[in-house]
């Protein structure tokens, strides 16, 4: 199929909140156009989207990013046969999953028998930065390597559990494990990608890109001074049991994501999934999801003020340049001026640098060159556009 990109541009006002904070507890920010902006990181919003995917896709088509892949596989084994010994299931899962990034045991036996590998190589000493010998360095490094997040699909976990029963508890070949991990790619792995440093053949190039959301205007961090009152104080107590501060800001955010439909179709391969439905789920989740940082303290869940969705055949086009000069608040706030800045900048980009979109839709306002629809109507039209492009 030809190149096909779906770009999603969202303007969304968020009241006092702390959606995404740094290591000091402050709301994340960025300097753009020489001005301090509110920022919500790309990983934070992608996490919110992945949690939202369960509303659009069956769990069996999704994945889990976890440190506990071994325990997950063992859980699947126990679900298939509750009579199995849990320790046995977990030990097998550890050995099978541990083959990723290592030589196949059968090949290693042949290599050792031929005398081409040094005895005791796995336990070879290593030198520290001062040149001092430290025993068992490679083994320690391998143990450390296990403490990394691994993106595994539910279908892959189930297939590994099936392999346990097919092998009757015997350790499988690395080839069998790798075949499972290369197939059965989940929707979220296909969208957001997977990197396996110790086994690059399992890498999956992300079909989607999600930008860091930034405010269209300058932002200053504010502080909420609060006290927590003791409901059962001592007779001589003063009532206040805790005093603290919470940092927050409020902003109108510009959010952007792009989906490479051709890459998505290649990643999902022969999964049997309808690509247009995956596209619709992605766009819906991006528009409606929100990170949950301190949401119980601020109740800041809002919906977008505007969503502008385009279908392109040339390249993705981020329109963040519309806000390089910070938007100034009007009598009606930041939203209307932000919409006008976005429309003006988009027109300039389409006239001077990139083609106008093949199709364009807008929800929540009017926008030059775009059909105005409600969310359901926009998704329906987009579904037909993608389906036609795939046929």
Regions found by a protein language model. Give the residues of each.
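Basic polyanion-binding and macromolecular-assembly surfaces
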Residues: 1-39, 45-391
């Amino acid at each position: 199929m030809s190149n096909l990109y779906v770009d999603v541009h969202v303007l969304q006002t968020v009241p006092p909140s702390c959606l995404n904070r740094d290591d000091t507890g402050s709301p994340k920010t960025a300097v753009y156009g020489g001005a301090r902006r509110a920022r919500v990181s790309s990983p934070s919003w992608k996490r919110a989207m992945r949690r939202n995917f369960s509303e659009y896709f069956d769990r069996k088509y999704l994945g889990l990013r976890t440190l506990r892949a071994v325990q997950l596989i063992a859980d699947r084994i126990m679900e298939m046969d509750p009579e199995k010994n849990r320790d046995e299931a977990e030990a097998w899962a550890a050995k099978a999953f541990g083959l990723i990034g290592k030589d196949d045991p059968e090949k290693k036996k042949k290599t050792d028998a031929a005398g081409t590998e040094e005895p005791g190589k796995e336990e070879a000493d290593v030198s520290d930065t001062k040149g001092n010998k430290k025993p068992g360095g490679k083994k320690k490094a391998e143990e450390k390597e296990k403490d990394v997040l691994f993106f595994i699909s539910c279908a892959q976990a189930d297939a590994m559990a099936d392999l346990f029963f097919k092998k009757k508890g015997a350790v499988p070949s690395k080839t069998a494990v790798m075949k499972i991990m290369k197939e059965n790619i989940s929707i979220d792995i296909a969208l957001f990608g997977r990197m396996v440093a110790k086994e690059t053949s399992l890498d999956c190039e992300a079909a989607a890109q999600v930008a860091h959301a930034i405010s269209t205007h300058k932002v200053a961090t504010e502080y909420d001074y609060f006290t927590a009152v003791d409901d059962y104080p001592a007779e001589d107590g003063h009532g206040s049991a805790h005093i603290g501060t919470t940092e927050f800001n409020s902003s109108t955010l510009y959010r952007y994501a792009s989906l490479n439909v051709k890459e998505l179709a290649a990643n999902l391969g022969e999964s049997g999934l309808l690509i247009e439905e995956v596209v619709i789920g992605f766009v819906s989740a991006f528009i409606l999801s929100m990170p949950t940082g301190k949401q119980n303290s601020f109740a800041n869940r809002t919906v977008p003020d505007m969503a502008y969705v385009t279908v392109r055949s040339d390249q993705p086009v981020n329109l963040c340049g519309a806000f390089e000069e910070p938007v100034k608040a009007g009598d009606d706030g930041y939203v209307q001026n932000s919409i006008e800045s976005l429309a003006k900048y988009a027109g300039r980009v389409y006239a001077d640098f990139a083609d106008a979109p093949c199709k364009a839709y807008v929800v929540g306002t009017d926008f030059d060159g775009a059909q105005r629809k409600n969310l359901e109507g926009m998704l329906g039209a987009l579904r037909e556009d993608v389906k036609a492009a795939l046929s």
